[in-house]
């Protein structure tokens, strides 16, 4: 068989969720390009419509289908692939490939597993097998033993005495408590943790046996407190191996690496220790027979010997979150090389695209420091304990590059956009030590700064945190620089990594200091190139980071300063309310500009995304998204304009201060598209309400209040219940439905702390209304409606958490015509140039406008996949000066139904409330498409792992006609207890305790009447044909909406 004739199946990772985020969109998109470069025909299957990799042009055939064996088997039947690459779709891709092999599907259709063999995957995921292989190799591993279910046992009916006896034996085998319990074949440390007492360990093992695909839990000796390191290794079929980089966690062992601040290259490991672990990493990857990228985790401690002591903790035989970080940190494209190695290419045969002179066989060398910090959703879940452990809770991460660790750390913290919201003045020294230093949490880095400002010593902080002294000395340097600023020394903190505006604010504590004064004396910010070789070869790829520390003079930026160029601001780290959808929009904007002959430069700091790939744009600037730093990029590139519409709230929020900063510097550069003031008008409820009133556009009664009394007065006028929320937020943060004065008073005084600078919005709650989302593009005159979506959930559930269907099912032509009319009026009233999202509600035949956002929305990718209309690309082109008429753009109404369903993180956040409401909680989404709306909904539930088995036992507490006929409905006194005993397999209820039990037991559930009615329709269609069809082949009518 020749290479050109091969058809390769690439399995994606599915929806964004905690433990598996956008890194697999990046790696999958890179792999698609790499395989096609080698002449392979690529078939891609993924369930996530928000990704670049599911664009129809990314592969020869793109299927948006559930990532589960039956759906993949149907695609295999249709496409007849020669091979499948499992290691590029995360844990989801590995698990489904293993299932297809076990079911005989791969053998039946002669599909080879390419790259890393399945036996190797089993050897790394099965902890006993892994321990034995390491022992054979002579590599030290933590003492461990496996607790497994017997042949006739299940996790719900295992004898309690037998379980306790096995746990007791396991504790004795590894040397006593504390221990680490790890669940096999799971994601992001799910079901894992450090356990200090026996009863907690029994509970953890019971949970782990239920979560594990092969019903096993590994109990290991605790190496908490050791240094955690990761080595990214690459190997080809010819046994050539290289180390891409090593990464060091600042947080000690006991905290998941996805939760830790991570630094590369390693700063504290002695060279002898590094060489020992480097040699071990190569020996391990060779012993296991891994081909392609691989991540090996070590624990290390200083035992007084030159090299210290290490343990091999685990191996990920696939591309991972750390692989994405390593790729962006070094410029070495791990996913691209992995894909080519899977085809049989040797490392020396694969070009290094950054240098253009070397190959993938050359190990990267870096002359800078990279720091990654996670981003947690603790603002969305105040009821959840965010103490960090071996199980992930973070949704995303930010990365920064600097010449020193201090500079890199400050840039990373700035990029994370995290506000600890701690009033340190109210925290005593004892509380600081016990609650913020000893207890690992998202606030801990900031607590370390605070401790040093109070005079804590390095030894004090080391005792409380376990952070190594080398790092603490650098934290202390940052704290000292902050103190120096207040005494008039502005050069030191600026050189260390503070922005001019931050230095001015610090210095103003000792007097009035202007940003111009700081800029005049602070070191200039210059741009350096990421080249994979520490300057040994000239780099041809424009991938940059800024530095302003000593020795950072001279800029490496090689932009054509005479060319028409634009800076596009990305979305930063993934968080709830601002997910990979905005990176999709950013990448489409880049592609649109490049198609138009305009240089496109991206400013972003998320290592997981396609927008931060080195060859996506004409210039990649890995920087925090602040007005000052974006303006520096504008100066370096001589850009004509900046686009802030595509990166979500992060990029929109920087628009006004950036406009002021550009004007302050006298730069001839504009914010392109919709005017910044129009964006503000749409977010300012009073101004927006007046705009709608002037045009006789219906809206819920209400307004904004700047005091408790004002809020109570508004609620009295509108009538309870009312919807309350702060202004200028994304994802419904702090939004609630309140029913009386007491609830409103509590909300205003405690939840948002209303003030004249922070008004609260009080609106009539439209109960039982049908909510709609509209995405549109305007060129300032004409308006193209990209799609109209009908929410499946009733009013009161945030649009980002509601399933929705396109085209709408229950709207008459008159309603659609009014929706179009209202959308067009708003677009023109706001002088919209670019994207516009309008959220509406229909009640008793009246169309009400809830809000409008003249920027990208989270539904843009879904609409584009459903209709085939590339609305983000169209928006970028009209922002660059083209008209919709010039572009010959047209609308399209799909013949099939597409349902977007959300994925919720409750299983990863113990203590969270699983009930849906006006505050957004979902992390990602899936899509189901079929000619029958019921089947589309059912496919979406399968993709979201929330599809019940018809005929299974169910508790139905919500009144939904006909749903119970599909199940064996049981009536129990204590529903949560029955669920935990395994007596309930599907739950229909809005009771928090019952829903929490369903989440813990991982059984399907619905919590609203609307979702239950949709599920009834889905189950009725479940036995029908799945209709797997490539995205590009889905039929669309050349019609207009309304």
From Swiss-Prot:
**Alphabetical list of Pfam families matching this protein:** CPSase_L_D2, CPSase_L_D3
Q: One GO molecular-function annotation for this sequence?
A: metal ion binding
Q: Name one GO biological process term.
A: L-arginine biosynthetic process
Q: Which PROSITE patterns match?
A: ATP_GRASP, CPSASE_1, CPSASE_2, MGS
Instruction: Identify which cofactors the protein needs according to its UniProt entry.
Output: Mg(2+); Mn(2+)
Binding-site positions, ATP 2: 725, 764, 766, 771, 796-799, 839, 851
Ranges for region Allosteric domain:
948-1042
Residues that bind Mn(2+) 4: 851, 853
Q: Where is this region: Carbamoyl phosphate synthetic domain?
A: 559-947
Residue positions binding Mg(2+) 4? 851, 853
Carboxyphosphate synthetic domain as annotated region, ranges: 1-417
What EC number(s) does its UniProt record assign? Answer: 6.3.4.16, 6.3.5.5
Record keywords: Amino-acid biosynthesis, Arginine biosynthesis, ATP-binding, Ligase, Magnesium, Manganese, Metal-binding, Nucleotide-binding, Pyrimidine biosynthesis, Repeat
Residues annotated as binding Mg(2+) 3 are 839, 851
Could you tell me what reaction this enzyme catalyses?
hydrogencarbonate + L-glutamine + 2 ATP + H2O = carbamoyl phosphate + L-glutamate + 2 ADP + phosphate + 2 H(+)
Where along this sequence does the record place binding of Mn(2+) 1? 297, 314
Q: Which Gene3D superfamilies match?
A: 3.40.50.20, ATP-grasp fold, B domain, Carbamoyl-phosphate synthetase, large subunit oligomerisation domain
The ATP-grasp domain covers 131-343, 689-880
Kindly list the positions annotated as binding Mg(2+) 2: 314, 316
Q: PANTHER family in the record, alphabetically? A: CARBAMOYL-PHOSPHATE SYNTHASE [AMMONIA], MITOCHONDRIAL, CARBAMOYLTRANSFERASE FAMILY MEMBER
Relate the assembly described in the record: Composed of two chains; the small (or glutamine) chain promotes the hydrolysis of glutamine to ammonia, which is used by the large (or ammonia) chain to synthesize carbamoyl phosphate. Tetramer of heterodimers (alpha,beta)4.
The Swiss-Prot or TrEMBL note on domains reads: The large subunit is composed of 2 ATP-grasp domains that are involved in binding the 2 ATP molecules needed for carbamoyl phosphate synthesis. The N-terminal ATP-grasp domain (referred to as the carboxyphosphate synthetic component) catalyzes the ATP-dependent phosphorylation of hydrogencarbonate to carboxyphosphate and the subsequent nucleophilic attack by ammonia to form a carbamate intermediate.
Q: Which NCBIfam families match?
A: CPSaseII_lrg, PRK05294.1, PRK12815.1
Q: What does this protein do?
A: Large subunit of the glutamine-dependent carbamoyl phosphate synthetase (CPSase). CPSase catalyzes the formation of carbamoyl phosphate from the ammonia moiety of glutamine, carbonate, and phosphate donated by ATP, constituting the first step of 2 biosynthetic pathways, one leading to arginine and/or urea and the other to pyrimidine nucleotides.
Q: Which family does it belong to?
A: Belongs to the CarB family.
Protein name, please?
Answer: Carbamoyl phosphate synthase large chain
Q: Which gene encodes it?
A: carB
């Amino acid at each position: 068989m020749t290479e050109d004739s091969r058809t390769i199946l690439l399995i994606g990772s599915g929806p964004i969720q905690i433990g598996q985020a956008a890194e697999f969109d990046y790696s999958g998109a890179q792999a698609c390009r790499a395989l096609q470069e080698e002449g392979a025909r690529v078939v891609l299957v993924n369930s996530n419509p928000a990704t670049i990799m599911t664009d129809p042009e990314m592969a020869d055939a793109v299927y948006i289908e559930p990532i589960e064996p039956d759906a993949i088997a149907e695609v295999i039947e249709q496409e007849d692939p020669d091979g499948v690459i499992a290691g590029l779709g995360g844990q989801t891709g590995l698990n489904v490939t293993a299932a297809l092999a076990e079911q005989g599907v791969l053998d039946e259709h002669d599909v080879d597993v390419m790259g890393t063999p399945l036996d190797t995957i089993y050897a790394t995921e099965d902890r006993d097998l892994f321990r034995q292989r390491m022992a054979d190799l002579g590599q030290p591993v933590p003492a461990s033993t496996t607790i497994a279910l017997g042949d006739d046992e299940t996790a719900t009916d295992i004898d309690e005495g037998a379980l306790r006896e096995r746990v007791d034996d396991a504790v004795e085998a590894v040397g006593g408590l504390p221990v680490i319990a790890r669940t096999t074949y799971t994601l992001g440390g799910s079901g894992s943790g450090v356990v200090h007492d026996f009863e907690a360990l029994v509970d953890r093992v019971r949970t782990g046996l239920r979560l594990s695909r092969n019903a096993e839990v590994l109990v290991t000796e605790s190496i908490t407190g050791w240094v955690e390191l990761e080595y990214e290794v690459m190997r080809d079929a010819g046994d050539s191996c290289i180390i891409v980089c090593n990464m060091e966690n600042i947080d000690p062992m006991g905290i998941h690496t996805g939760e830790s601040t991570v630094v590369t290259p390693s700063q504290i490991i002695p060279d002898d220790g590094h060489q020992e672990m480097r040699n071990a990493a190569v020996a391990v990857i060779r012993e296991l027979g891994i081909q392609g990228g691989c991540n090996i985790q070590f624990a290390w401690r200083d035992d007084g010997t030159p090299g210290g002591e290490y343990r091999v903790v685990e191996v990920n035989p696939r591309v991972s979150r750390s692989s994405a970080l390593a790729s962006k940190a070094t410029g070495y494209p791990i996913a691209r090389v992995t894909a080519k190695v899977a085809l049989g290419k040797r490392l020396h045969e694969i070009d290094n695209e950054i240098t253009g002179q070397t190959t993938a066989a050359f190990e990267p060398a870096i002359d800078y420091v990279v720091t990654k910090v996670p981003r947690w959703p603790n603002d969305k879940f105040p009821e959840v304990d965010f103490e960090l452990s071996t199980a992930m809770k973070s949704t995303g991460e930010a990365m920064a590059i600097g010449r020193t660790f201090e500079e890199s750390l400050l840039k990373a913290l700035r990029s994370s956009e995290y506000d600890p919201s701690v009033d340190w003045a109210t925290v005593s020294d004892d509380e600081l030590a016990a609650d913020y230093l000893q207890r690992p949490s998202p606030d801990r880095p900031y607590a370390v700064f605070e401790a040093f400002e109070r005079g804590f010593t390095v030894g004090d902080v080391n005792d409380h945190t376990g952070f190594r002294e080398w790092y603490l000395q650098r934290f202390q340097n940052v704290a000292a620089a902050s103190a120096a600023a207040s005494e008039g020394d502005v050069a030191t903190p600026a050189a260390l990594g503070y922005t001019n505006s931050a230095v001015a604010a610090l210095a103003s504590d000792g007097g009035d200091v202007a940003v111009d004064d700081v800029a005049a004396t602070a070191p200039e910010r210059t741009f350096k190139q990421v080249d994979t070789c520490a300057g040994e070869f000239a780099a041809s790829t424009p991938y940059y980071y800024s530095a302003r520390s000593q020795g950072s003079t001279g800029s490496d930026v090689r932009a054509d300063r005479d060319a028409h160029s634009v800076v596009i601001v990305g979305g930063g780290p993934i968080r709830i309310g601002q997910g990979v959808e905005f990176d999709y929009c950013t990448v489409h904007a880049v592609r649109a500009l490049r198609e138009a002959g305009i240089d496109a430069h991206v400013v972003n700091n998320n290592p997981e995304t396609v927008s931060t790939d080195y060859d996506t744009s004409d210039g990649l600037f890995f920087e925090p998204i602040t007005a000052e730093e974006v303006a520096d990029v504008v100066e370096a590139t001589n850009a004509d304009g900046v686009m802030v519409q595509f990166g979500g709230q992060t990029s929109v929020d920087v628009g006004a201060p950036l406009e002021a900063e550009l004007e302050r510097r006298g730069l001839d550069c504009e914010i392109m598209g919709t005017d910044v003031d129009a964006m503000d008008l749409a977010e300012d409820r009073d101004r927006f309400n007046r705009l709608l009133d002037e045009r006789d556009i219906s809206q819920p009664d209400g307004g904004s209040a700047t005091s408790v009394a004002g809020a109570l007065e508004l609620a009295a006028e509108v009538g309870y219940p009312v919807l309350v929320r702060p202004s200028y937020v994304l994802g419904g943060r702090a939004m609630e439905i309140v029913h009386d004065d007491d609830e409103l008073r509590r909300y205003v005084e405690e939840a948002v702390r209303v003030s004249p600078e922070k008004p609260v919005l009080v609106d009539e709650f439209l109960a039982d209304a049908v909510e709609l989302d509209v995405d549109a593009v305007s060129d300032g005159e004409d308006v193209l409606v990209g799609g109209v979506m009908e929410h499946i959930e009733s009013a009161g559930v945030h649009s980002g958490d509601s399933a929705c269907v396109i085209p709408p099912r229950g709207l008459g032509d008159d309603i659609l015509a009014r929706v179009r009319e209202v959308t067009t009026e708003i677009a023109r009233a706001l002088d919209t140039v670019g994207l516009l999202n309008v959220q509406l509600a229909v009640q008793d035949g009246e169309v009400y406008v809830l809000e409008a956002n003249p920027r990208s929305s989270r539904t843009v990718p879904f609409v584009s996949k459903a209709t085939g209309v590339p609305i983000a690309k169209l928006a970028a082109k009209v922002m660059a000066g083209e008209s919709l008429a010039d572009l010959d753009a047209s609308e399209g109404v799909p013949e099939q139904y597409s349902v977007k369903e959300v994925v919720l993180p409750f299983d990863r956040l113990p203590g969270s409330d699983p009930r849906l409401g006006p505050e957004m909680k979902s992390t990602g989404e899936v899509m189901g498409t079929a000619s029958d709306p019921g089947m589309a909904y059912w496919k979406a539930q399968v993709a979201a792992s929330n599809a019940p088995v018809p005929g299974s036992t169910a508790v139905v507490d919500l009144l939904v006609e006909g749903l119970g006929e599909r199940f064996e409905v049981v009536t129990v006194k204590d529903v949560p207890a029955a669920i935990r005993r395994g007596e309930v397999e599907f739950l229909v209820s809005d009771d928090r305790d019952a829903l929490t039990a369903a989440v813990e037991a991982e059984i399907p559930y619905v919590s609203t009447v609307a979702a239950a009615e949709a599920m009834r329709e889905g189950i009725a269609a479940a036995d029908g044909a799945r209709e797997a069809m490539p995205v590009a082949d889905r039929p669309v009518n050349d019609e207009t909406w309304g």
